[in-house]
Structures are given as C-alpha cells and as structure tokens.
Amino acid sequence: MDKTAEQIIRRRMHGLYLSRKCEDITRLSRDLMGLHCWFHRNVVFSAHIRGAGLTGWKRALTKTWLYRGTLHGVVYEDLPLLLAPHARDHSWEHLLLREMMSEDRIQEVIDRIVGLMGDGVYSRAEMRKIFADDYEQRVIDYLFSSWGGIFVTLACQGKVAFRDMTSRDFDLIDAPPLPMDDHVLSELLRRFFAAYGPATLADAAWFLGLDKNTLINLPVPEELSRLEYGHGIYYYVDDGADMGDIPALTLLSGFDPLIVSYKERGAVLPEEYKKAVILKSGICLPTVAVNGQVAGIWNLKNGKPTVEFFASQPQRIRKAAAELVDELRWSVAGTI
C-alpha cells in the first residue's frame, strides 16, 4: 500500500469511527447517514464495534428502505433529507403490479392500506387476510411480499416505516421527502464526503443510488478538499483533526460501511477475497481487517465466536481477533 492509499484508508477509518469511538448510536447513525440493517444484528455489531451504547437501540433509530432499496436504521429527523433521492422509487413488486392493474387502481390499494394502518392494522399477515377476498393470490403476493412489496413505495414517500428495528410490522409516519434540488443534493454530498471521504463522485453516486451523470455538472461543495490518486479525484472534509493510525486489527460488521459504501473496494477488500466476503445472494459477511485490509471473516454461530483468516497470520493476530469476537459476544448478549 503506497502512502496516498494509506492516507485514504486512514481518513476513511477515522470518518467511519473505526479508529476512534462514537458513544451515541443516534449520532453514529446521523454521521454515517444510516446504519445498514439487512439483518438487524448488523446494527448492533456495527454500533458496538464503533463504541456506541446499545441501550434503547431498537427505538432510537427508524428502520426503513433507503439507498438502492437497502434497509437502514436512521435518525427519524433525517428521513426527509435521506429519502429525497428515492421519493419516486418503487419496489420491483410494484412494477410487476403495473402489468396487472392501472396506477390509479394501485393508488386505491395504497390508500386502503394507509386507512387500515390508521385503524391499527400493522402487519402484512393481517393485510393478506383482509385483501384475500378482493384480489387474486398473485396480486396479494406482490402487495405484501416479504421483500417489502407495496410498503417500499410507501416508505420511500415517507409514509411508513418499521415499528422498531427488529419488527416486521409497520407504523404510519409523517416524513415527506425534501424536493430533490441542487441544494439538497449538495447537502447529501457534503455529508457523504464528511463521513466517507476521501471518496470519488462515482462512490457518492453508488452510495446514494444515483446516476453518476446527476453529479457531473453539480458544483462540488466549496468546503471539500481533494486529492488525485490513480485516475480519480477524491473529495473529503479536512477539519484539521488527528486522523490517528490505521488499527492493526479491526472487526467489521456485516455490510460494514468501510466495504459496501464504495464503488471501488479494492483498497480494503482484495479481489482474491471478494467472493468469500460478498456472497452471490448479495450478503456481505462480517470481516476482520488487518492493517486496514480485509484478511478474514468472523461470526457468531449458535452463540459461539468463529474467526477464519484467508491466509496465514501471526499467532498474536489470531489470538487478538478471537478475543475481540468473544468480547463482542458477551457485550451484545441479550441485545439481539
């Protein structure tokens, strides 16, 4: 790793609270623009690894769909901003429904769902029973799919979210997305580069789920610093803070921001390990980083810690990794 690549990794690990601590899970989620929660325990692992307390975590954040249809735990007050790029997003089930009924009729269904939620019906299972006599099974399956169905559309409109971080049921909310203008986009970019920088515009487009062309003609916020590396320009916020050293050993959660938030991941995730970390299903496993680069995977299986390195590591590294996973196991016991 050359000096510039090392500088990039050092700044990223600082920004993502991997070389310093963030004790407040709400601040952590706000700074990172949400915590990935395909599996809700990812939030617990990610927060603990970064030093955040877990008391009341299930209701401290709001679970909803954001970037590229991924589930995140976010600060409720941030929803209008974070939902702005996705206000018109639909689930694939919604798109399939358009082949079977008009958009006006889909809207009638949506209005009925919102009305039922106002009357206290929150679960997809209950909704299925209520709608069973009015629609064919295929429509019911699309509407109330376990992958989200029509609730993805409602969530992107800021009308519903999960009842808490571990629930499968929904609540009505009132968080209409901000209009997606240049001011909102600039604020999203500023926040992204403050936490995830140094990063490229391609990284920002990937993270936010936008077409890169959307960002090409937008003025880059003036407060951003930049560096050139390889064939790219990397933006970041230089606040004069001590970046600290790259930790010799770091646990990363499943779908950890250090891995999944960037279009180009080679600096952190060596190509030869990619298939072992990111499965064909899209799941990103919990990993162990040695000197800022992924070197193995870890997990809690049946409550027992496991660590598997991809290549030979010194005994002190293997022992330290096992101890970190074991400490995490005891720290989160009863939380997930």
Question: Language model features by range: what are they?
Answer:
Residues L83-L97, A175-G197, L249-S253, L258-V260:
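Short, amphipathic alpha-helical interaction segments positioned at domain boundaries
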Residues M1-I130, E136-Q137:
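Phosphate-backbone binding and catalysis cores of DNA-processing enzymes
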Residues E271, V277-I283, T287-I336:
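Glycine-rich, small/acidic residue-mixed loop/short-helix segments
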Residues K58-L71, C156-M165, E223-Y229, G296-W298:
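A short, conserved structural fragment
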Residues R124-A132, L201-A205, G292:
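A short acidic, leucine-rich amphipathic alpha-helix
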Residues E223-E272:
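Non-catalytic regulatory appendages
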Residues A194-M243:
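Anionic-ligand-binding alpha/beta catalytic cores of soluble enzymes and soluble regulatory domains
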Residues I140-L215:
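Loop-centered beta-sheet repeat module
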